[in-house]
Amino acid sequence: APTAFYGVR
């Protein structure tokens, strides 16, 4: 998943 949207997940 793109870090720019989710950060950390």
UniProtKB/Swiss-Prot annotation:
Chief localisation class: secreted
GO cellular component entries: extracellular region
Keyword terms, alphabetized: Amidation, Neuropeptide, Secreted
UniProt modified residues of type Arginine amide: R9
Record's subcellular location: Secreted
One biological process term in Gene Ontology: neuropeptide signaling pathway
Presence of the UniProt keyword Thylakoid in the record: no
Job description of the protein: Myoactive peptide.
UniProt protein name: Callitachykinin-1
Source species of the chain: Calliphora vomitoria (Blue bottle fly)
Lineage: Eukaryota, Metazoa, Ecdysozoa, Arthropoda, Hexapoda
